[in-house]
């Protein structure tokens, strides 16, 4: 977790070689250039959390007197364009509209009917706060449930929501991933659910309290316990919390990382935003198994997709 944080911080401070056309200037996204051009904060202040930094940025870009200076070319290259992306290097009104949606939060934990009708609330910073756009934690956003329920063999009443999953007391070595100690384990909860309704991918459920994987246990326990140290909850309770959770991906340079999600489930950013609109509805209806509570605050309409996609594309950088 902390290694990833250092890695992404190093990317932000990375400098290209002098032989490059940009003359050794820092590699930045259109979003980063937009922040600099408008005197907006690019990093959290001392002792400021990423989410508070993101909220401060939201206040500034929504201020009545804010007059944005847009980005129309790459200041680090003679042709003004990306070197490794085919899209224009720009941050304009559509990207700003998407940024405002990305930073927006509902008035309460759950989006109200009025907020759902109005849209434009992504609540993305709950897990993807700037500047790294990842909280390096574990969440269930519904990818496993969508994958499981999509297979025709699972129709006729079978669903991920009702799938029997072993508890800590009933989980056996055969339920877990294969290790040196248990080389013939079935991996049935770390599998693609295409052949049988007994297969699915439960993410960190396979790792937590797994005696064959001792190294990450302390970090996982802290995340599942929402940062409480020492954790007052039993491993049995935490195992239920671990169902279908996966590590938050960072959002910088997504143009080089398709297909998306841990299982390559989506080919486009538009599909992902539609997915979040759908799973947020499931979360509010109580039909998303072990879903992240943050999903209930998303209030987006179909018309919001394009602006959010434009903003996410503005996070692309010239890394190979």
What are these regions (language model features)?
Residues 1-320:
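Periplasmic c-type cytochrome electron-transfer domains
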